[in-house]
Amino acid sequence: MSKSSIRRRATAFGSAGALVTATLMAGAVSAPAASAAPADGRGHPHARGWDKEARGVTIAAARAARAGVDWEDCDAGWNLPKPIQCGYVTVPLDYAKPFGKQIKLAVDRIGNTGGRSERQGALIYNPGGPGGSGLRFPARVTGKSAVWANAAKAYDFVGFDPRGVGHSAPISCADPQEFVKAPKADPVPGSEADKLAQRKLAREYAEGCFERSGEMLPHMTTPNTARDLDVIRAALGEKKLNYLGVSYGTYLGAVYGTLFPDHVRRMVVDSVVNPSRDKIWYQANLDQDVAFEGRWKEWQDWVAANDATYHLGDTRAEVQDQWLKLRATAAKEPLGGVVGPAELISFFQSAPYYDSAWAPIAATFSKYVAGDTQALVDAAAPDLSDTAGNASAENGNAVYTAVECTDAKWPTDWNTWDRDNTRLHRDHPFMTWANAWMNLPCATWPVKQQTPLNVKTGKG
């Protein structure tokens, strides 16, 4: 299934800068409540069924602590300039078999600027997804603002590619060039035949994941990524973890805090995912559709308030009408032959995700309404010549699918999906069906699906 038209959970820095100063410099956000675990894994908060993994991560962390990280200048292809340094941390593919197959996780860092006397340790970042790379974190925040400069005095900034992502044993589910081809089918089905076609694509995508990355799939889970985090912590020589997670990264942080409560020093979470096990992940995506609709309306209100600039209407209803006209036009004949409703949703989806995208998207939309179709085509159409970018997009989508589908059990009965999304679409049409097709491979996922951890949260 080719799904590059839908971007996944935000992989961004968002408003985390303010949280870094308020929290990292002052104190910790409460970690998820859990009982402490001895170093050998006995009495682990999830000892029943998790004994092997608990012991495995202890073994892997001890190895990593001895090995450390062989920091070097980053490979030119990573586009991470000096003084950022890069390296790898070795972890087991399967923590139940710590002496079995190993994979390497890419990490990078930039040292704290305040000297040894001010240093409070390493700050490890996850941007969300799942499927987002954190390697750009040190480069993007260094010198970005006074807020980050203050945190940089005390912390080494550390990024990493989670397992399966980028330079860390990357997985794939489809040919990247086929993955990005456009236009895709309209996500909103007009008939039962449309639904059958989308179901077929979802089933084929799940099969492609197994064919291309079958060995990795059973181990592409949030708990395993949390275990990887603990091994990285050990490799860095840190007794406790300082962590910043955004969007999905907040769930990763919650799982880490549940598995390793004694290893948490300070933890900052921004744009929080509800970690309740009955939400992960089917219900969470339905809830996300509701949130998207609310944010979509907020953007439309902002556009209407700035009608003197964008000329898209001075009420939300008028802006929505312009959107529906655009969508109908693209459904009838894709703009430039490549931008249909799916590509439009992918482009406009950034508005609900990021306030910083509001003005650029409104400006492009305004140009279209004024007669400049090409500006919108250039912004929304895939670039088939960008082979590296397309490979990255396909990889990110593969990891997203693998983690969410393997993390938890999903409905296997199509009638459940059809009922829930048909109902939800009536009042929340912007993303509902696009999100449904994005996740439908989980209904026919070819490897065993796990039961989410019972993340017990405490007061923050």
State what each model feature region is.
Residues 2-15, 26-187, 192-195, 226, ...:
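Catalytic-loop region of hydrolases
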Residues 133, 226-227, 245-259:
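Glycine-rich nucleophile elbow surrounding the catalytic serine of serine-hydrolase chemistry
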Residues 170, 176-235, 446:
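Active-site-proximal cap/loop segments of hydrolase catalytic domains
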Residues 45, 56-58, 320-459:
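Alpha/beta-hydrolase fold active-site neighborhood
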Residues 172-184, 255-318, 363-373, 383-387:
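A catalytic-pocket lid/entrance helix-loop region that shapes and gates access to the active site
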Residues 130, 163-166, 207-210, 249, ...:
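Alpha/beta-hydrolase active-site loop signature
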Residues 236-248:
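Alpha/beta-hydrolase fold nucleophile elbow
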